[in-house]
UniProtKB/Swiss-Prot annotation:
Enzyme Commission no: 2.1.1.199
EC primary class: transferase
Record protein name field: Ribosomal RNA small subunit methyltransferase H
Encoding gene per record: rsmH
Function: Specifically methylates the N4 position of cytidine in position 1402 (C1402) of 16S rRNA.
SUPFAM superfamilies, A to Z: Putative methyltransferase TM0872, insert domain, S-adenosyl-L-methionine-dependent methyltransferases
Alphabetic keyword roster: Cytoplasm, Methyltransferase, rRNA processing, S-adenosyl-L-methionine, Transferase
Organism in which the protein naturally occurs: Bacillus cereus (strain AH187)
GO biological process: rRNA base methylation
Length: 310
């Protein structure tokens, strides 16, 4: 069962400025925390479309929210197909869209999914379990140079080269099959003094591999642009990010769509295609309160940004 503590619950949903009869999208259903709070604010004409790649998350939510009938619609899909899937449902615009980019706790805590460095399990890390690429493929098939690049770019790991060398040497004799084996190699690649600070030594490499397996940054960038197009004027987009790479994409995308580009002087009117699409609701990200951080340690790196369609 999905026992998932939702991060920035009220701030994210209230930030959408809910219209009770509106149409909303939860791009990251997960344990259904945001969906539950959002559904409770809708009247009979309102509806929520919830996306998730995980079949278990979809089935749990269908049971949990069965009393809402046709007000609650699930879509088993990566949110990169947001626009296409909504159009298949006959929906061309919506009143609000939310993204919570954290891996849901049930996925992290289910050992066989291979997301966690706390459990020994097969190397998997796929959000969509029908997807072809796994963490096993990345760790055993990708070149030293590719591993260094993703560890550094996606994990911001200072010891990327040392860790990649350990992996390269080990797999010459035997495939790396489990998260436990990978954790040991990561530890060997990080100098002892550095292992004692900054949380679990495998955290950054596991993040990097997960991002690579699921193509998370490119997917998010595409989906955020689609969300901005799909939201009607006055509608909002709420985004919770959990690391600097995601936050940078969100911040840059919101900023680019909320500013007027440099135009030749003397234009009598600004053409529509150059007018800002968004108004920033949050100039700086909203962070979890001290109370929330005490109750849920996983919220510590969360940042919420909200923008409104002009």
């Amino acid at each position: 069962m999905f026992n998932h503590v939702t991060v920035l619950l009220k701030e994210t949903v209230d930030g959408l400025d809910i219209k009770p009869g509106g149409t909303y999208v939860d791009c990251t259903l997960g344990g259904g925390g945001h969906s539950s709070y959002l559904l409770s604010q809708l009247t009979e004409g309102g509806r929520l479309i919830a996306f998730d790649q995980d079949e278990i998350a979809i089935q749990n939510a269908k049971e949990k929210f069965s009393s809402y009938g046709e007000q609650f619609i699930t879509v088993r899909s990566n949110f990169r197909y947001l626009s296409e899937k909504l159009q298949e449902l006959g929906i061309t615009e919506v009143d609000g869209i939310l993204f919570d980019l954290g891996v849901s706790s049930p996925q992290l805590d289910t050992p066989e999914r291979g997301f966690s460095y706390h459990h020994d399990a097969p190397l998997d890390m796929r959000m969509d379990q029908d997807a072809p690429l796994t963490a096993y493929d990345v760790v055993n098939s990708w070149s030293y140079e590719q591993l260094v690049r993703i560890f550094f770019q996606y994990g911001e790991e200072k010891f990327s080269k040392q860790i990649a060398r350990k992996i390269e040497a080990y797999r010459e004799n035997k495939a790396i099959e489990t998260t436990g084996e990978l954790v040991e190699l990561i530890k060997e690649g990080i100098p002892a003094p550095a292992r004692r600070t900054g949380g679990h030594p495998a955290k950054r490499v596991f993040q990097a591999i997960r991002i690579a397996v699921n193509d998370e940054l490119k997917v998010f960038e595409e989906a955020l642009e689609s969300a901005i197009e799909m939201v009607k004027p006055g509608g909002r987009v709420s985004v919770i990010t959990f690391h600097s790479l995601e936050d940078r994409i969100c911040k840059t995308t919101f900023k680019r769509n909320s500013t007027t580009p440099q135009l030749p002087p003397g234009l009598p009117i600004i053409p529509d295609e150059f007018k800002p699409k968004l108004k920033l609701i949050t100039r700086k990200p909203i962070l979890p309160s001290d109370i929330e951080l005490e109750e849920n340690n996983r919220a510590r790196s969360a940042k919420l940004r909200i923008a409104e369609k002009r």
